[in-house]
A protein has these predicted regions:
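Acidic donor-binding loop at a coil-to-helix junction in glycosyltransferase catalytic cores
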Residues: 182-189
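A recurrent flexible, glycine/aromatic-enriched loop bordering the glycosyltransferase active site
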Residues: 147-166, 181-182
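Active-site donor/metal-binding and catalytic loop motifs
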Residues: 196, 201-236
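Glycine-rich, basic loop-to-helix element that forms the pyrophosphate-binding segment
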Residues: 72-89
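Non-catalytic, C-terminal membrane-associated alpha-helical segments of glycosyltransferases
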Residues: 224-228, 239-296
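Conserved donor NDP-sugar-binding/catalytic core segment of glycosyltransferases
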Residues: 102, 106-136
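Short aromatic/hydrophobic "clamp" motif used to bind/position activated sugar donors
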Residues: 94
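Acidic donor-binding segment of Leloir-type glycosyltransferases
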Residues: 30-71
Length: 296
């Protein structure tokens, strides 16, 4: 009887936002893992207006018992699609995963289910050593991916939605800010968690981030993300290093100079960043300079 009540308590919805990525392999892997836990589960995908080819490829997942693919006709962005998934989920615990990931450990789901409670749990992520996405992989591996011990020092600032576990009741109370269409929506969600007094627990339960994004595309996405910070300087200052640097430049009246230096060096910066040996320091200046240019 105790075992049965525990199974009911641990009912899990695995939620995957989809945009132009075939996630059949990921879902089949998660499905096999979930069967081994013996807990009730569902896998729910929400397609954010992908191309026809990707939609057709992912529809095969509807044949799996407990798996649903929901398709939206217009693109809304990651914040909206995660809120939509949380609303559509049937079970009391939610596991959000990005489509370009793959669990590292075979006990991936079990580790999350051991941490069921009134908290958010972040498992982290890592990058394969080899890959052609030089800038994206280098930035991800050296800046974004951090061990749990490091993430615990600033748990809310280190929240990233690529791989996290949350009670549905808490998620629906906090939700993602849908005014962030793409970029820093994770940061805003971390702030909302802190404002609500919800604990964030960081553990070692990573996924591989199997990114396939050339540097030029990553720079376009970076610029879109940086634009999201305009008008949010005060709100996100404690959470975003770029804004703290910008604030320092403002104090020294150096924003216009930084914007000018960015504009005259932009092509040289992009030449380095799209090459095989991109400099992360130059990438940091690229983002800061672009934000300064937007601000003047």
């Amino acid at each position: 009887m105790l075992y049965l009540s525990r199974k009911i308590h641990n009912m899990l919805s695995i939620l995957i936002p989809v945009y132009n990525i075939n996630c059949v392999s990921l879902v089949r892997k998660l499905y096999e893992m979930a069967l081994l836990t013996e807990f009730p589960f569902e896998i729910l995908l929400a397609d954010d207006a992908s191309c026809r080819k990707v939609r057709e490829e992912n529809r095969v997942l509807n044949r799996l018992d407990g798996c649903r693919v929901l398709e939206l006709e217009t693109n809304h962005g990651p914040a909206f699609i995660r809120n939509y998934l949380g609303e559509q989920a049937r079970y009391p615990y939610l596991l959000f995963l990005d489509t370009d990931t793959s669990p590292v450990g075979e006990d991936f789901l079990s580790l999350y289910l051991k941490n069921v409670g009134g908290q958010v749990v972040c498992g982290g992520f890592c990058y394969p050593e080899e890959g052609d996405s030089f800038l994206r992989n280098k930035y991800g591996a050296q800046v974004e991916a951090q061990p749990a011990a490091e993430r615990r020092k600033h748990p809310y600032q280190h929240f990233i939605s690529m791989n996290f576990f949350i009670p549905r009741e808490l998620f629906l109370r906090v939700r993602f800010d849908e005014t962030f269409h793409l970029g820093y929506e994770d940061t805003a969600f971390g702030k909302r968690l802190e404002d609500a007094g919800i604990q964030v627990l960081h553990i070692e339960n990573p996924v591989w981030h199997l990114v396939e994004e050339d540097a030029a595309s990553f720079l376009v996405k970076t610029r879109r993300s940086v634009k999201n910070l305009l008008g949010r300087e005060r709100e996100l200052l404690p959470y975003v290093r770029l804004l703290r640097w910008y604030n320092s430049l403002k104090r020294f009246h150096a924003v216009a100079l930084t914007a000018f230096l960015f504009r005259i060096s932009e092509s040289l910066l992009e030449k380095n960043l799209t090459g095989k040996h991109p400099s992360l320091r130059l990438f940091a200046f690229y983002k800061l300079g672009y934000f300064c240019w937007l601000s003047v």
